[in-house]
Regions:
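Short acidic low-complexity segments
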Residues: 29-36
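A short, hydrophobic beta-strand-centered structural micro-motif
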Residues: 39-48
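A short, polar/charged loop/turn motif at coil->beta-strand junctions and beta-hairpin connectors
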Residues: 38-39, 59
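Charged, amphipathic alpha-helical segments and their flanking helix caps
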Residues: 1-29, 47-126
C-alpha cells in the first residue's frame, strides 16, 4: 500500500499503474504498441473510460489491465494474473479492483490467451 504523503505520483493514474508494473519487472505496454505473436507474458494497460459518481462531485475512472500469455502457456495464465494483482496492491488506495474480470480469451491475432482485470480510481471533478 502506498503512503500518500511520500509517494512520487506521475502525471496520470495510468502512468502510475504502468510504472508500478514496470518496476516489478513485468513487461508492460500501452494499447497498440505491442504487435506480432506473443512469445512471452506481458501486460497491456488502457484507460477504460469514466463515469460520474451519482452522489459526490467525483469521477470514477476505469483501467483495464490485460494479461497475455503465449498460446502454448495457458497453464501460466492464472499465476500471472495473480502476480499482476499482487503487484498492483502496492497502489492501494489510489486504485482498487472493481471485481470485474473477464474469462480467459484466446486472441488469434496475437496467438495469446488473455484475461482483463478492471481497476477504478476516484477523482475529484475540477
Amino acid at each position: 500500500m502506498i503512503n500518500p504523503s511520500e509517494y512520487q505520483y506521475e502525471d496520470s493514474v495510468w502512468q502510475d499503474i504502468y510504472k508500478c508494473l514496470k518496476n516489478a519487472d513485468i513487461e508492460v505496454y500501452a494499447p497498440g504498441i505491442k504487435t506480432g505473436e506473443c512469445i512471452h507474458k506481458y501486460v497491456v494497460v488502457k484507460n477504460d473510460g469514466a463515469s460520474r459518481h451519482p452522489e459526490f462531485s467525483t469521477d470514477v475512472e476505469l483501467y483495464a489491465v490485460m494479461c497475455y500469455v503465449p498460446k502454448q502457456a495457458y497453464s501460466t495464465l492464472e499465476p500471472f494474473v495473480r502476480e499482476v494483482q499482487e503487484v498492483l496492491l502496492a497502489l492501494r488506495p489510489m486504485i482498487k479492483p472493481t471485481g470485474v474480470r473477464t474469462p480467459s480469451y484466446y486472441d488469434d491475432t496475437y496467438k495469446a490467451h488473455m484475461v482483463s482485470i478492471s481497476y477504478r480510481n476516484y477523482k475529484k471533478v475540477i
